[in-house]
């Protein structure tokens, strides 16, 4: 099943200055992003001709001289493989016999191989839960006592084809534990909604991350699951591929502008290598109600990345199939909420979103509201100085024209 749409690609608000724009253009040249004005975006569920349908979603964004591939799958834990090529003709090749075997190496390829400019992956390995009862925000371990985590490799997922929406370029992976003796997910689910975009814009709901045709958005929602404590905090364990012996870098950006995400002045980024390369971008906020707003905002904390042994993590067949078995993994945790304030316990709802992309991460310019406030704040003193100068000038002129009668 497939849906496609022409989408405009451009810097838009991503360029704070002409000098920075030229710098970005020069460095983007190796990635084949020069001159990209449009991208043809398509979503396709790759069929398994050998047996039951498997959830393998391919997002393909084709430009004049480049292609971006995002391959999502719930085979094992939910994962995405990101690939950027310098040709509009690169294709995804899937060998289902290999992919579903105990040794899936080579079961997933982007061809031609020599066109690949960047590739990496994210794997959402575990759903975490902590008991924050009687824990203060100033405690040494403010998250509280951990419950046994839910391995996402042991989840049962919906048929992704049923949720594929070509009109919005979106699809949703929705799952629950296969073994749930306490029935904590009897009326609940964990959902990962993936969406590609036809142009640079913002969603209507917070945190309103600026996106382009070079990005796709992931919205994670925990809905209706029964917490194991009265004030449970939830989180996600996330694994990614290291760059050689090193882990990707985590950066924080701060702003004076919070119009798009009220009371949130920070943007977090995960960067694979030096720019331009791949990135993940999110605001450190989650929401305990739908739609999200200031009153339901929860803090989102990201732990430092650390090297992780592959055998200690739930394994993703698509990551193994594309990258092989000899890889350095790094992991970090995202946790949502605090022991005080709003939380999942309010409505048994939690949502958080991030952007994934290739190239330079979108950069927020100042919103029209903030620009207006700054113009007034900076313009008023200037007008007062100008007015004062005119008064002094006219006053001086009046006295200079006075002639003594003597």
Swiss-Prot record:
Glycans are attached at residues 65, 134, 159, 187, 230. Residues 36-372 are lumenal. It is found in: Lysosome membrane. Residues 1-35 form the signal peptide. One of its GO terms (biological process) is positive regulation of transcription by RNA polymerase II. Coiled coil: none annotated. Highly N-glycosylated. N-glycosylation is essential for GLMP stability and for MFSD1 lysosomal localization. One of its GO terms (cellular component) is cytosol. InterPro entries: NCU-G1. This is Glycosylated lysosomal membrane protein. PANTHER family: GLYCOSYLATED LYSOSOMAL MEMBRANE PROTEIN. A motif (Lysosomal targeting motif) lies at residues 402-406. The keyword Ligase does not apply. Residues 394-406 are cytoplasmic. It comes from Homo sapiens. Required to protect lysosomal transporter MFSD1 from lysosomal proteolysis and for MFSD1 lysosomal localization. Interacts (via lumenal domain) with lysosomal protein MFSD1; the interaction starts while both proteins are still in the endoplasmic reticulum and is required for stabilization of MFSD1 in lysosomes but has no direct effect on its targeting to lysosomes or transporter activity. It holds the Pfam family NCU-G1. The keyword Oxidoreductase does not apply. It is a single-pass type I membrane protein. Belongs to the GLMP family. Induction: Transcription is activated by TFEB. Keywords: Glycoprotein, Lysosome, Membrane, Signal, Transmembrane, Transmembrane helix. The chain crosses the membrane at residues 373-393.
